[in-house]
Curated annotation (Swiss-Prot):
Gene name of this polypeptide: RAP
Conditions for induction: Down-regulated during infection with the bacterial pathogen Pseudomonas syringae pv. tomato avirulent avrRpt2 strain.
Coiled-coil ranges per UniProt: none
Signal peptide (UniProt feature, chain positions): none
Ubl conjugation listed as a keyword: no
Lineage of source species: Eukaryota, Viridiplantae, Streptophyta, Embryophyta, Tracheophyta
Organism: Arabidopsis thaliana (Mouse-ear cress)
Name used for this protein in its record: RAP domain-containing protein, chloroplastic
Length: 671
């Protein structure tokens, strides 16, 4: 329907012969009624309340967008004729409008068409680290600072804004409601909780002080409310372990496995978590799917060699925290393989910096289910705790017993990893070592290959093992695995055992293997073998297992190369070194003792001061790790007096005066 309205009689238009055609494309009837007051002021009143007046530039632009025809409306408007109309409403809203404009929520010029809402992705795994929402959050922080300083009125003057107060017709509202209702599933994850992640330190400190003050009000009422919220969260998490739909479980598991990146895996899992939290029942989040999701995330990180900082940023995401919390909730219901996958995944994602309480939880559950573990589970769980420097004595005692009962099912790579784990955390492994001595007595049971073999120790699929344990099992090792086993026996002080003798004799067959100083793997292997050989010469010369002179020289040259052995002096070590000068003694820094480098040494009196940082100790128990104990024992066997100074003990003394007194105290009797 269209109507032609002659405006020549109503307005002084330039040019006067212009006629405007108004076409209604949406079947809305446009009724035009003229009055004498509107003639005088140059205003065209319309029956549609949304566009009651046409005169000011903002209204002219709006009508122009609707009709696409009225291009020559007058600019002058008689405010007295309009009376109390839209301008008064606009002036009342000016104080609040500048804030909306400052945050980018409205169009300051009102000349652009309204932005269409883009289709939002279901989940954004790394939105906080890679997205551009930090701009909006920075403006919100600035807005809080402006309001706190009482500068809102001045900002309103600096940023004037005339915003129309539009009144939408009922038909339009109904249509938009319909559209909004259809888009609800796509916007499930668009919450404002993510905006709290990247506030600056000043705002966080202010908010922390405010929380402390509020918590002390009303007799701790707010603290009680906080505890209730935690209980509600625990109840909500408990519903994830309820009955589930088998078909939904299979579909979710397939989607997790087919995801090619860690971000995709987390996105698929986060969708389901949010859906279950909003009432999806039965839940497809079975313990198997949760363990698989964590395992695939870690494996995809390994596949692309994701940097450590990137992994930590990934682990701090809200979706990732929810997934780990679910894994801890359903951990008792997981199978042995699921517990193994979760522990391995946490070690790869968080390393030694994250998941302290989570690993305690894993240790508790794993100890209760250790009887269900196979050789692969035992090796992977032990390796996860060792790589995170997380001590778990009770768990490792049970793992040693379990490994001794199924020793014939172990592969060479699994034995190497298990022994390295016990040695790294300096955990006793007598049942395991005794079973190795009894199961592998002959050197014919050991095979060595010089090239690296692709192993699948981290895969979910279990290895098939023959049930015929009556025959003598055979083990295959590569060069690096032999080095790890030999180093582990040296750390544990068990080089007199028969299994070590067989391993060491097999390792000597690598005499023809060419060691190069240009490759890190060769240098690491040579360093391990060199230290073990020195331990054999110093601690157990009666065994006569030390290497021949030619091979010893070759390994010594590769192990002592500076290409991959660059020394880094920590600030802690520098601080202690400055205080040692005041003792008046001639201390030597980075002194070499038969392959080991002593931090500070008094060479004349053979006193070695070891300045041990956090990497020398377990992160949760504070006990020395295996490599630290081996160094102390070896330097002591070389005839030196070893004094250890840990960072934790150092920080307990404040001020240089107290620290110097502590140094003199621990050195008493050695100098």
């Amino acid at each position: 329907m269209e109507c032609v309205v002659p405006f020549r009689r109503c307005f002084c238009l330039n040019p006067p012969e212009t006629r405007h055609r108004i076409v209604n494309h949406n079947h809305r009837n446009l009724h035009i009624s003229l009055s004498s007051s509107s003639f005088a002021s140059g205003i065209l009143p319309l029956s549609n309340k949304k566009y009651r007046f046409v005169g000011p530039l903002a209204q002219r632009s709006s009508l122009h967008r609707r009709t696409d025809s009225l291009k020559h409306l007058p600019f002058s408007v008689n405010a007295s004729v309009i009376g109390n109309s839209e301008e008064e409403v606009e002036e009342e809203d000016d104080d609040g409008d500048w804030e909306a404009e400052f945050l980018g929520e409205i169009d300051p010029l009102d000349i652009q068409p309204p932005k269409k809402r883009k289709k939002q992705k279901n989940s954004k795994a790394l939105e906080d680290t890679e997205g551009m929402d930090w701009c909006v959050r920075a403006r919100k922080i600035a807005l809080k600072s402006i309001e706190a300083r009482g500068l809102s009125s001045r900002m309103a003057e600096v940023m004037p804004l005339k915003k129309k107060k539009k009144k939408k017709s009922k038909k339009v509202i109904v249509k938009k409601d319909k559209v909004k209702s259809k888009s609800i599933p796509e916007d499930d994850f668009d919450t404002e909780d993510e905006d709290l992640d990247f506030e600056d330190g000043f705002v966080e400190d202010k908010m922390g002080d405010l929380r402390k003050r509020v918590s002390s009000l009303a007799g701790g009422m707010f603290e009680e409310k906080k505890e209730k919220m935690k209980e509600q969260l625990a109840q909500r998490l408990s519903q994830f372990s309820g009955p589930s739909d088998r078909m939904k479980e299979i579909n979710l598991n397939k989607a997790i496995i087919e995801a090619q990146t860690a971000e995709e895996v987390l996105e698929v899992t986060a969708e389901t978590i949010m859906a279950v939290a909003k009432g999806l029942s039965p839940s497809p989040l079975s313990p198997l799917n949760i363990a698989t999701a964590l395992h695939r995330i870690a494996k995809n990180m390994e596949k692309v060699s994701m940097m450590r900082t990137r992994r930590l940023a990934f682990a701090r995401q809200r979706e990732m925290s929810m997934l780990v919390a679910l894994a801890m909730t359903c951990l008792p219901e997981c199978s042995a393989q699921g517990i193994s996958n979760i522990s391995w995944a946490l070690s790869k994602i968080g390393g030694e910096l994250l998941y302290l309480t989570e690993m305690d939880r894993v240790a508790e559950v794993a100890t209760s289910k250790v009887g269900e573990f196979n050789s692969q589970n035992v090796a992977n769980i032990a390796g996860a705790f060792a790589s995170m420097r997380h001590s778990a004595p009770e768990l490792f005692a049970e793992l040693s017993k379990r490994a001794s009962t199924i020793i014939n099912t172990f592969k060479g790579q699994e034995i190497a990893q298990l022994l390295w784990s016990f040695a790294s955390l300096y955990e006793p492994a007598d049942p395991l070592l005794e079973s190795l001595d009894s199961a592998f007595k002959s050197s014919d049971q050991f095979k060595c290959y010089l090239t690296k073999e692709i192993t699948n120790s981290d895969e979910v699929v279990d290895a098939e093992v023959s049930d015929d344990v009556s025959r003598s099992p055979a083990l295959s090792f590569n060069r690096d695995q032999l080095g790890n086993i030999a180093w582990s026996y040296a750390v544990l002080g068990q080089v007199e055992r028969p299994f070590f003798a067989n391993i060491w004799n097999t390792l000597t067959t690598l005499e023809e293997q060419r060691l190069s100083e240009q490759y890190r793997e060769d240098v690491m292997f040579a360093s391990q073998v060199y230290l073990v050989n020195q331990c054999l010469k110093l601690e157990c010369p009666h065994l006569q297992l030390s290497l021949c002179q030619e091979l010893e020289e070759k390994i010594s040259r590769a192990g002592k190369t500076k290409r991959f052995n660059q020394k880094i002096t920590s600030s802690f070590q520098k601080e202690v070194g400055r205080l040692l000068i005041s003792t008046g003694l001639d201390w030597a820094k980075e002194h070499d003792v038969d392959g080991y480098t002593v931090d500070v040494a008094l060479v004349e009196k053979k006193v070695a001061l070891e300045i041990d940082g956090p990497t020398h100790f377990s992160r949760n128990s504070g006990l020395p790790l295996g490599h630290t104990m081996l160094k102390r024992r070896y330097v002591a066997a070389a005839g030196w007096k070893v004094v250890s100074l840990s960072l934790q003990e150092w920080e307990e003394h404040e001020g240089s005066h107290e620290q110097l007194e502590y140094l003199r105290e621990i050195l008493t009797g050695c100098i």
